[in-house]
Amino acid sequence: MIDTSIPLVDLHRHLDGNVRVNTIWELGHQHGIALPADSLETLAPFVQIQGKETSLVAFLKKLDWMVAVLADLDAVKRVAYENVADAALSGLDYAELRFSPYYMAMNHKLPIEGVVEAVVDGVKAGLKDYNVKINLIGILSRSFGQAACTQELEGLLAHKQHLVAMDLAGDEMGFPGELFNDHFKRVRDADLAITAHAGEAAGSQSMWQAIQELGATRIGHGVNAIHDPKLMEYLAKHRIGIESCPTSNLHTSTVASYAEHPFRTFMDAGVLINLNTDDPGVSAIDINHEYRIAKSELKLTDAELAQVQRNGVEMAFLSDSERKALYAAKV
C-alpha cells in the first residue's frame, strides 16, 4: 500500500495539533493547570476526536487543550521534540511541521519570539535522536485578527532562516485572506514559500484570493475547489499543490463521509494532491492511517497511491537537490 521505494512525506501537519495525551496530563500536573478529567484515560475524549465534531470550530476546541498546558518554553521545546519523534516513529522520511507561535503563547503569555526559538531548539534536539528530515512552517492565525498576526509575523521573521514557508490558518469565514495581504507581502519579501488554508470552510473564491493575492503555491484542504471548473483547470495547469487531509475533513464535518471526499475528483482532473494528517494528535491517526483510508474508502489503487506519494515529494518545500537526496536514501 505504501511504496517503500518512494519517500513518505507529511506536508500538512500541525505541531501544536500533535501533543501526546500523556504529555498534556504530565504538563498539566507539573504546572498546576486544571484539566477537564481526573485520569489519563478519561482525558482522551476531551483532547481527541470521538466520532466527528459538528464543525471546524468545535474541532479546534480539542486543539485548545493541547496549547493550554504550554506553561513555559521548556514545555514548548518538549512538544517540538516529541513531534520529531512521532514523525520518525510513524515511518515518515520527511515532514513539514507548522505551528502558530501566537496560539501557543497566548494562554500563559509567553514571548512569541521565545516560542519560535523553543520550537526550533526542540526540533534540533529531536533531529539528533531520530532519523527523519524536518522543515518548519510558520502560521499566522487569522482568528486573532490583523494586529495579532503582525506580532506573530515579527516573531517568525526574526527566525526566518529556520523556516521554509508561512501559512494562513484559522477562521476562514470570519477573517478572509484579503485582510492579510500586507502580511504576506512581507513573507514574499523574506523569500519564504507560501501555503494557505483555503476552500475548507469558505468557497473557491478564498482559494483564488490565496493564490493570486497572498502568493500561495500550495493550498491546505481546498475541498471546495471542485465546484469551480476554472479553478480546477488553473490548479492542474500551474501545479498548485492541494494538501489533502481526508480524516481531518471528516472530523471537522467539512465532508459528511469519506465517500463524499473530493480526493478522487482532484486526481481525475490532474491536480497535484497528496495525503496528510493535519492534527494527528487530535484525530488520533498517523500517515499510515491516511493511506489505508485512501485505499479502502477513497478507492485509490496501489498505482494511484504511489503517485500520491510522489506528488508529496514534488509539492514539498525542498530544493531539487534535497528532493533527489530523499529518493536516493530509499534505494
Swiss-Prot record:
Record's keyword annotation contains Hydrolase: yes
GO cellular component, one term: cytosol
Active site: E200 (proton donor)
Keywords recorded for this protein, A-Z: Hydrolase, Metal-binding, Nucleotide metabolism, Zinc
Binding-site residues for substrate, renumbered to this chain: H14, D16, G170, D279
A GO biological-process term: nucleotide metabolic process
Positions of Zn(2+) binding: H12, H14, H197, D278
EC number(s) recorded for this UniProt protein: 3.5.4.4
Reaction catalysis annotation: adenosine + H2O + H(+) = inosine + NH4(+); 2'-deoxyadenosine + H2O + H(+) = 2'-deoxyinosine + NH4(+)
Domain of life of the organism encoding this protein: Bacteria
Important for catalytic activity, annotated site positions: H221
Cofactor: how bound: Binds 1 zinc ion per subunit.
InterPro entries: A_deaminase, A_deaminase_dom, Ado/ade_deaminase, Metal_Hydrolase
Cofactor requirements of the protein: Zn(2+)
Keyword Hydrolase part of the UniProt annotation: yes
UniProt-recorded Gene Ontology molecular function terms: 2'-deoxyadenosine deaminase activity; adenosine deaminase activity; zinc ion binding
UniProt feature coiled coil, ranges: none
PANTHER family attached to this UniProt entry: ADENOSINE DEAMINASE
Job description of the protein: Catalyzes the hydrolytic deamination of adenosine and 2-deoxyadenosine.
Family that this chain belongs to: Belongs to the metallo-dependent hydrolases superfamily. Adenosine and AMP deaminases family. Adenosine deaminase subfamily.
NCBIfam families: aden_deam (TIGR01430), PRK09358.1-1 (NF006846)
Protein name, UniProt field: Adenosine deaminase
Organism: Shewanella baltica (strain OS185)
